[in-house]
Amino acid sequence: MSTTLYDKIFQAHIVDEIGDDALLYIDRHLIHEVTSPQAFDGLAQKGRKVRRPDLTFATMDHSISTRSLAIDACGPANKLQLQTLADNCEANGIQLFPVGHQKQGIVHVMGPELGLIKPGMTVVCGDSHTATHGAFGALAFGIGTSQVEHVFATQTLKQSKGKCMQVKVNGARPLGVTAKDIILAIIGKIGHAGATGCVIEYCGDTIEGLSMEERMTVCNMSIEAGAKAGLIAPDQTTFDYLAGREYAPKGADWDAAVAYWKTLKSDTDAKFDIVVELAATDIAPQVTWGTNPGQVIGVNQPIPAPEDFSDPIDRDSAVKALKYMDIQAGQKLADLTVNHVFIGSCTNGRIEDMRAAAAIAKQGKVAENVTAIVVPGSVAVKAQAEAEQLDKIFLDAGFEWRLPGCSMCLGMNDDILSQGDRCASTSNRNFEGRQGRGARTHLVSPAMAAAAALAGRFADTRDFIAND
């Protein structure tokens, strides 16, 4: 019987079947300081140990300061989280990459760059953006703290099999259109709950033409479409990225692994529950206008009115979003001034993102009304960017160049916005209060964020590219 990539990975990891559910073996468990403490406590209370510490890797990312290497820089509560993670990892023999370690970084940035994620794996983390790792053809999804404890104890997880949605994107990308624009356009088309109950497989010649870092950006925001996970079949681009990385197979093991990885693709006549198609040629640089990622438009489109939506829930959501974001239907995004710009996160904190933003930043100076920060996703990204002197480009233009961490993606550290602030952000969520109480978040690509920083308002990155 013809099967999808999702089917193949799911079936290969079934340890036992429990009614309509399956007990899946977990190949890789990534942890950080926020969702692991209670799981470790539960384990200790029951007198259990971590079953496979060798398959578990930890980093510090959410609660850390991007201004200082001191673990107490974000206050006593965050320090306690970080110290607790360090103590738990030491007690259980888990590899930890703490603040200051050369391999430290945002969990979904450092994992791939170390070669920890491989095609065909099951990957979990107490973090919703675990879907990032689906870019490698791995079944990767976020889990809750009680599930983190279950994986600690058994290296398995009970799961029900979801539907499979195929998203095809074909055609040449227009000037200035990035992977971030592609995934925002997808979410705009299907809605922020459009893939609920599904695993998305992204395909088509546009997707095949993306680099691994671009594929990670696409898969990262699968959760913002309502999906459990996102997948892209591995190919030569995947193999080239993994070759030589620290935790990648070597020698004969590499040859055997690649031979297996080449089988990890949906059969040509596999049936999908839902099929969605987009033409890349129709996509423009995107900006979210509302309070969920599905409320998104091309940079030169007017902000929609509630009556433009046929669904009553969407209409109500639009009314609330317009009020919260302090914008008007019909208004142009170019009329909106921004006072903050954030470039970073597990969505757009990799070296290609730094390069794209720097290509715009070198064309001017940050506007007087704007505070702009650039936060590399890992120590390795920071080092590479500095080797290419990208940090100098940012600093000369008036951006702040920070230490690695999750930073302003979420209001969980010292990079928090204030009431009424408007931010062009390369992160993944624009929910009310996501970057601080009363703050207004607009999701954009790194190039669009850099353009907004220079213009002091939303600007079409294509104008900057044309002048480069």
Swiss-Prot record:
Organism domain of life? Bacteria
Name the pathway it acts in: Amino-acid biosynthesis; L-leucine biosynthesis; L-leucine from 3-methyl-2-oxobutanoate: step 2/4
Q: Which keywords belong to this entry?
A: 4Fe-4S, Amino-acid biosynthesis, Branched-chain amino acid biosynthesis, Iron, Iron-sulfur, Leucine biosynthesis, Lyase, Metal-binding
Instruction: State if Lyase is listed as a keyword.
Output: yes
- Provide any one GO MF term from the record: 3-isopropylmalate dehydratase activity
Q: Which SUPFAM superfamilies would you find in this protein's record?
A: Aconitase iron-sulfur domain
Q: Which residues bind [4Fe-4S] cluster?
A: C346, C406, C409
According to its UniProt record, which reaction does this protein catalyse?
A: (2R,3S)-3-isopropylmalate = (2S)-2-isopropylmalate
Q: Which InterPro entries match?
A: 3-IsopropMal_deHydase_lsu (IPR004430), Acnase/IPM_dHydase_lsu_aba_1/3 (IPR015931), Acoase/IPM_deHydtase_lsu_aba (IPR001030), Aconitase_4Fe-4S_BS (IPR018136), Aconitase_4Fe-4S_dom (IPR036008), IPM_dehydratase_rel_enz (IPR050067), IPMI_cat (IPR033941)
The protein's Enzyme Commission number: 4.2.1.33
Q: Name one GO biological process term.
A: L-leucine biosynthetic process
Q: How is the cofactor bound?
A: Binds 1 [4Fe-4S] cluster per subunit.
Cofactor requirements of the protein? [4Fe-4S] cluster
What exactly does this protein do? Catalyzes the isomerization between 2-isopropylmalate and 3-isopropylmalate, via the formation of 2-isopropylmaleate.
Q: Which HAMAP family match?
A: LeuC_type1
Subunit architecture: Heterodimer of LeuC and LeuD.
NCBIfam families in alphabetical order: leuC, PRK05478.1, PRK12466.1
The UniProt entry's sequence similarity note says:
Belongs to the aconitase/IPM isomerase family. LeuC type 1 subfamily.
Identification of the protein by name: 3-isopropylmalate dehydratase large subunit
What is the originating organism of this protein?
Pseudoalteromonas atlantica (strain T6c / ATCC BAA-1087)
